[in-house]
Amino acid sequence: MTNIIEVISILIFAFLQLACACQAAQAGVTPYPRAPGDQPNLDFPSVRVNDIPIDTVNTDMNVGYAHFAFLGMVTVEVIARETINTFDLSPHRYGIYATANGNALSFQLSQPRKMHLKINDLPRFFIFADAPEENPPQPGQPGVYDLRNYEVSSSLDSIQTQKIQRTIDDVAAKRGILYVPPGIYRSGELRMKSGLTLYLAPGAIIKGTGEVSDYPRGELGTQQIYLLDCQDVRIRGRGVIDGQGRALRFSTENSADSRTKLIRSLRATDCIVEGVILRDAGTWAIHLIESSDLQFDNYKLISNTILDDPGFPWELNTDGFDPDNSSRVIIENGFVSCSDDAIAVKLKYGTLSSMDDIQFRNNVVWTVKSALKIGTEVRDHKIANIVFENNEVVHADRGIVVYCYRGASIENPKWINNYFEFIGDNSKRMNMEIKIQDDGGKGYLNDVLIKDNTFERFSPNQSRLHGLDSIHVISGVTFDNLVIAGKKRMSPADAQISVNNHVRNISFR
């Protein structure tokens, strides 16, 4: 009986999706449906785009979102559950003008955007407005394999790890596309294999189990999706991967076993993650170890935060991205909401070697901790050519950060054309903190470029630029067109930056 009910539910879901799609196609709007098991957002019960209804989604993390694709110019209307007295629509630099009327907020979009909305004291809400997918795979096409043909069905309750893993192995051996249709597929750890494309259709969700026993613990810990010793893997689509990290941490009272990464790579090459929503990691969301030639594009990453969920009993280490001992990594056109560092470039795990060429660009960031960071765990070897460019930082405790703590030599890092709206709300409250410190090793930092960066205001505490000693100095720091509080700043004093005696060759221009 349960299986019959589930089949009927899926058919109804598919019918409603098709009906909405036909209506929306006439308006150039593609609504993406809530996945089974997800609940509507009661704080924002309605979103309409060109008068087409878009599903709103509530999450266990006390934030919500709506997701759609569009072409041309569209009008977005968001309905809140109460009269709008104050609102803040970010990123500010996009210059999108919004109007409030009663409990309705309206604005227009002419290109894909990821928007952060705060209304009154309501929980935060996100608008994920994508471009339409180009040639998404369809069941029945050559090389496309439907998950349902492998005895895997949508189920709110069934744990299907082994069946899904066998399907992955089979499709990867054929270098095919595994099509995950709309529905909920609950699973423990899944290992990707070389040659696989994993496609999550709109309305599809791979959801963790919330049970530690479903995640075998290795030397590096546990993970939901594992790219281990593989190459040429694609994870794409407009569906969701949800790690159930909050439930995992509650289930074991925050034990090490519950700190499950959402995606971990180890010795992976030539892999792409594109378009999907990534939700609820147990700790660092994306940990990339000893890997190369990786790309994350148009992702949407949402992890638990202590500001959204103050009743959570443990401090959260929910970093967004941690490229670690890896090279040639591009993270772009995405959205990060997390409690710990949005990105922290590290050199800690794997067989340590020098790392080079990490690019974090065109992203929207909201974090409780550091926004654009190198460190803390950087050991012994060289880290070169790390670039943070064209990012919109909505909220952070620190904006530009280098913690050269454990002996690494960091060379030629760049922060170019980033915009910072709010800095504060946590322990340090600094626009910038760049320093060398002996925490198991004495490092070096050379040739820092901070160009065309804008901070809307001064941070509550002074920024900091501190070398360690007469040998372990920060050498060569260029501030080019640094704007704070509406004015170009031309000296450390003017920019409210504390500089110690172990910094050489600072210039402003």
Regions inferred by a protein language model and the residue ranges of each:
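Extracellular/periplasmic carbohydrate-active domains that bind, remodel
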Residues: 11, 19-509
